[in-house]
């Protein structure tokens, strides 16, 4: 090895040099404070790849950020105080304590042009290019080569839709909570790196996240579309004012914000999150939810077929004993997706239905076994759902409250064309308007 202005130096001479620095491994821990760093980084055993945020607590300075706060409160959060406070606390946590992951994904679903990116871009300027990533290519996040995720504390995913991709959904759920990531860079040896990524998703699509009924990983907002679309004088002035906010002033606000009582896992339940759960329902869950909305169980009468060749559709009452075969046929017929699924078999249906009806030791589906019908004398396998009120309460507790609540029963008669009185028109001249 030849070094400039120096005599030839062999590798073994460099290895034997008393001031040569060596490490057991290189890893990532987002702090430069010796009091906060793990011992292996302080004593030099491991090399810390973290270089510090672009705007530190020392380089941040106070200034006017009211346009930004107003935007987050009234556009992002539609004036809701609870979600506004949570949003600011979530951001402050990423800035103040990046070594403590929120493990909660911030999701923004809206039309184009509402100003989602203006806020995340400011966060990116605070964190710097080493720790911030804004990505719209799915392969760079979930593909074979993922080195772009290395050393990141905030990853913003732009316009990434799941569209039923269970594989990507499973990978992403693991990424949110995993303690370590395998970094795979082209032409390099794979290595393990500790995870400190927080995630945000900005999208226009209806299905933004794979939010199952029991999901607690997502904080979902639907920003107002007040200023989106073609820009007029009002919206132009609004965004020009927002653009005057300086990242160093936002950094000062976030560094100084008190988050001592913030618990990231206590995510506000939003209507937008409920919408994502509805989008993510499995076919069996969807049919069960529709049955709870309608107030009866979908069944198929095994007694025959109508003139069109369709099986007789009957309704079963919640709380009543129903034949197992009739429930299977009725719910399958109620779901076009299940009807078209070549791999849909009874065993799969019952496994999914029992899973949908059971949570934390509670169940609303009861197997009564094979019993003889006292009137017909026929022995059949019967199941029973809990009463409707109990089933709806179970769904609210373990899934979500339906948008607008459950339908209310009423004694009022619905006026239909068949029941309306058209006698006044029957004797009128059909060529003249009544």
PLM features per residue range, with description:
Residues 153-176, 208-215:
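Conserved AAA+/SF3 P-loop NTPase catalytic/coupling segment centered on the Walker-B
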Residues 193-197, 211-281:
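Phosphate-sensing "switch" segment of ASCE/P-loop ATPases
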Residues 145-150, 184-202:
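AAA+/SF3 P-loop NTPase mechanochemical coupling elements
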Residues 169-191:
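Conserved catalytic/switch belt of AAA+ P-loop NTPases
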Residues 1-63, 67:
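Conserved glycine-centered beta->alpha loop in an early N-terminal alpha/beta scaffold
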Residues 161-162, 204-208, 224-229:
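Conserved nucleotide-binding/hydrolysis micro-motifs of P-loop NTPases
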Residues 38-156, 163, 168, 219, ...:
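P-loop NTPase catalytic core of nucleic-acid-dependent motor ATPases
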Residues 112, 261-434:
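DNA transaction DNA-binding modules
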């Amino acid at each position: 090895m030849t070094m400039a202005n120096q005599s030839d130096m062999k590798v073994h001479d460099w290895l034997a040099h008393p001031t040569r620095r060596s490490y057991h491994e290189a890893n990532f821990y987002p702090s430069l404070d010796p009091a906060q760093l793990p011992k292996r980084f302080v004593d030099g055993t491991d090399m810390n790849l973290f270089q510090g945020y672009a705007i530190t607590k020392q380089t941040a300075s106070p200034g006017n950020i009211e346009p930004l706060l107003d935007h987050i409160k009234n556009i992002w959060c539609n004036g809701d105080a609870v979600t506004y406070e949570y949003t600011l606390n979530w951001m402050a946590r990423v800035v103040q304590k990046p070594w403590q992951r929120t493990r909660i994904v911030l999701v923004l679903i809206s039309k184009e042009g509402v100003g989602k990116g203006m806020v995340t871009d400011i966060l990116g300027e605070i964190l710097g290019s080493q720790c911030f990533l804004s990505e719209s290519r799915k392969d760079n996040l979930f593909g074979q080569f993922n080195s772009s995720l290395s050393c990141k504390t905030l990853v913003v995913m732009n316009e990434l839709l799941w569209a039923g991709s269970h594989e990507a959904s499973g990978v992403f759920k693991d990424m949110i909570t995993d303690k370590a990531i395998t970094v795979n860079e082209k032409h390099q040896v794979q290595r393990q790196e500790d995870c400190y990524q927080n995630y945000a998703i900005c999208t226009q699509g209806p299905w933004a996240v794979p939010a199952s009924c029991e999901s607690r990983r997502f904080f979902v907002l639907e920003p107002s579309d007040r200023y989106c679309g073609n820009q007029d004088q009002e919206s132009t002035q609004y965004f020009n004012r927002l653009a005057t906010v300086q990242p160093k002033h936002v950094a000062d606000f976030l560094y100084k914000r008190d988050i001592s009582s913030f618990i990231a896992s206590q995510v506000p339940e939003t209507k937008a999150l409920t919408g994502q759960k509805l989008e993510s329902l499995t076919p069996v869950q969807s049919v069960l939810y529709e049955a709870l909305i309608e107030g009866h169980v979908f069944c198929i009468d095994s007694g025959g077929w109508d003139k069109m060749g369709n099986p007789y559709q009957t309704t079963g009452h919640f709380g009543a004993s129903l034949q197992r075969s009739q429930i299977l046929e009725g719910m399958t017929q109620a779901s076009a997706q299940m009807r078209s699924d070549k791999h849909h078999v009874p065993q799969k249906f019952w496994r999914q239905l029992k899973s949908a009806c059971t949570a934390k030791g509670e169940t609303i589906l009861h197997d009564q076994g094979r019993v003889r019908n006292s009137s017909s004398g026929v022995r059949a396998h019967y199941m029973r759902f809990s009463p409707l009120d109990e089933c709806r309460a179970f769904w609210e507790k373990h899934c979500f409250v339906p948008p607008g609540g459950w339908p209310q029963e009423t004694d009022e008669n619905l006026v239909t064309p068949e029941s309306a009185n058209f006698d006044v028109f029957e004797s009128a001249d059909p060529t003249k308007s009544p």
